[in-house]
Amino acid sequence: MMVTWSVSTVASCQHSCGRSRCSFENQPRLGGTIRLPARFSALKITRQQTIPRWSLSVYRLLLLILSLPGAPALAQNAIVLVGSGSSVPAPIYNRWTQEYGKQNRNIQMRYLAVGTSEGIKQISHGAGDFSAGEAQLTDKERKEGGLIELPVVLIAIVPIYNLPDVHQELRLSGEVLAAIFLGDVKTWNAPQIAKLNSEITLPSLPIQVINRPGGKGSNYVFTDFLSKVSSKFRAQVGVTASPKWPVGEAAERSSDMADKVRGTRGSIGFVEYQYAVKGSVAQAAVLNAGGRFVKASSESIDAACQAAEAPRWNNFSASLADAPGADSFPITSFTWIYLRTRSSESARTGALVDFLNWIYTDGQQYAAQEGYAALPAPLLAEVRKKVSNLR
């Protein structure tokens, strides 16, 4: 089906999004004719209408994605692939949108960060073409929702902190991190932390814990690691995208987490590596399974995947947390793209497969540039085989 949309601008934010300034303010609304899934039905979209709030209904999700600032102009009759999910991989999807769009004006992609759990819900209910996140699909989601997950790049969740008077590298183990986020370790000069940092004079500041609300992929990766290294954490919280944190205040988005920690003296939180780098916030070195304290980098993220056994690669939903190896960063994970295995729209399926083939070839070169790590070549070969079966 065809959808026509027009060009206009919004002079000020009327979205009731609660922000003092909104990214939609004074943004041009590009125009054109695009090809969308038949399930969206015929409608004429004009950007002279404003969106009342960040609704996640199918139609409003579509409107938001079509008007994302900075998106490349659409060719006539372009197929627009619509995706939503975790904010963790949002920067790499945005980069892929730009680079792929330069090469192919007939297939475009729009991605909106709404959280891992919400993204899975959207794709399960038929909204969009794919979703993305860091949580493993449940058997119910695979069977009843007809979904599969494929890894796209490697990510790391890093502990970040704000101790202005500490200039040396802070070291933390998984057990100490678990104790902090359980509320058992309450001050920065507690014996458990001091033992790992004998060369640092730690302040007697209370620890201000900052966590994430429910439905977030970074929660899943972080709790997966903490559950592997702490039996108490596993029993009290467990591996989940929606943990019931016993202490702390929540940061809604990954960028909010970096901002909160940077602005709160004595705080600790966790965020995807590239957000920590771009947010200029201090990162702790974490004790890995090889007995070394390692900081996150594209190299240490890659090392964790390389050190994992090959069967864990071939199981595309496998956990990489606490991987072996002296150089491995221990809070490493795949970030996945979630796809429906059944589609009646061959043109859209073909466009999606073309896009996937690109991200598993040319697209991988942008991973390290954006603060992630590319998938190892043997794993890429296996994933491409899976993609070829989607047609």
Regions found by a protein language model. Give the residues of each.
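Bacterial N-terminal signal peptides
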Residues: 60-70
